[in-house]
């Protein structure tokens, strides 16, 4: 796989996304898609997601972030391309 076939993004997810199993569900979906990175709660109530993997898989994860698990109410997902960072080794819940 060529490097240009990979995508590295950071996403910030707003809404009712803490205390609803959002991070663990994100990890489960990411692992199924073979996407590396992390999901962590932020003090302002959002969840930050770092994702690295095949472009199609990362795009599928981004699509899923807009819905999240059943108990979540996602109001916004902002994404930004990441450049110059070492890709993560697995997917962690922080």
Curated annotation (Swiss-Prot):
Matching PROSITE patterns: ACYLPHOSPHATASE_2, ACYLPHOSPHATASE_3
Keyword presence, Nucleotide-binding: no
Superkingdom of this protein's organism: Bacteria
Catalytic activity: an acyl phosphate + H2O = a carboxylate + phosphate + H(+)
Active site: residue positions: 23, 41
Record domain Acylphosphatase-like: where: 8-94
Broad enzyme group: hydrolase
The keyword Ribonucleoprotein belongs to this UniProt entry's keyword annotation: no
Keywords for this protein: Hydrolase
Entry-linked Pfam families: Acylphosphatase (PF00708)
GO molecular function: acylphosphatase activity
Protein family membership: Belongs to the acylphosphatase family.
Protein name per the record: Acylphosphatase
